[in-house]
């Protein structure tokens, strides 16, 4: 194939349509060097600004010389290049994590939104076979994604439809360690695949076909389940056990960097079935939150050490506080205005709950903790609930409960109204 053929494929696929700056992961091997040649030659046609990034793994004598040569190559092409050196005990997993952390740093520094890698169809076959041998979940057998959004960046693999034999022989560096069988991927490439191809000469095509078929099923399930609210456990549990598992796995696809193991997935299932309330980190900076018949998985956000200070509102005054407008004795108009009888004789305190808080209901004092449990109020709502207090007594827990004084007491003491309107924060 000629270079213009690759350009036409890139344009047809629209890989760089949404991107002005792209970082190319440049290893120095044939695939990444040819991708460098295509992208640097056709920057104008692709309408991108190209930035190079290289990791020197320091595992071979030649690696420092290769780094120098790549610096020269970047200078000749008048392109910026960022280089980082790997240190510490080497493993495939540690090296991969190091590379992607470094690439993200480069993207943040340069304002690039696309990371381009030179993975090709042969890499795809090796990846699917590795995952199959390790016993991964079915959806992961679809292999490497052609385009993958991770956070605010997109990883693009424009060579995924091509085999290594499609690339012309150009200047590149040969990693002699690829011929050794110390690493799993090398054993797949050098030993297992050649043996399997003796049984089926089209074995690579067969593996790629299976990967594409699994991807089709995955996309179809996602589309068909689009109107199912998996986070609503009543809805989720209305399906069979098998369907529940598939729906939950499809839901987890929303978090590509979560990567739960089979054991962790089973644990999440068990928590959803058995716990009424639960909040705990699960993996990779995510937490599972369950509140009765609802659950969600989300990134752990930093929590403030303390709630906002208590607010004091005086008669004939208004204040906006935590998403509400409070108006003490000054009427507000509108259908959604909440009205709470209060006294004009003293100020109103608005705050969050404290240990030992009680509310008077039907003449009896009830601890807020017990009230929240009885009403099955989720923990997050308990912590964020606004309490309206006057004369040292709780008048109302906003949106949850109100102090139901006797009619005579209300008429004697409550001689004005606190108007409350929900507003945007």
From Swiss-Prot:
Keywords: ATP-binding, Cytoplasm, Ligase, Nucleotide-binding, tRNA processing. One of its GO terms (molecular function) is tRNA(Ile)-lysidine synthase activity. GO terms for cellular component: cytoplasm. SMART domains: TilS_C. The keyword Cell division does not apply. It is an enzyme of class 6 (ligase). One of its GO terms (biological process) is tRNA modification. Gene3D superfamilies: HUPs. It holds the Pfam family ATP_bind_3. It catalyses: cytidine(34) in tRNA(Ile2) + L-lysine + ATP = lysidine(34) in tRNA(Ile2) + AMP + diphosphate + H(+). Its EC number is 6.3.4.19. ATP binds at residues 27-32. It is found in: Cytoplasm. The keyword Nucleotide-binding applies. The N-terminal region contains the highly conserved SGGXDS motif, predicted to be a P-loop motif involved in ATP binding. Belongs to the tRNA(Ile)-lysidine synthase family. HAMAP family: tRNA_Ile_lys_synt. PANTHER family: TRNA(ILE)-LYSIDINE SYNTHASE-RELATED (PTHR43033:SF1). Ligates lysine onto the cytidine present at position 34 of the AUA codon-specific tRNA(Ile) that contains the anticodon CAU, in an ATP-dependent manner. Cytidine is converted to lysidine, thus changing the amino acid specificity of the tRNA from methionine to isoleucine. This is tRNA(Ile)-lysidine synthase. It comes from Streptococcus pneumoniae (strain Taiwan19F-14). The gene is tilS.
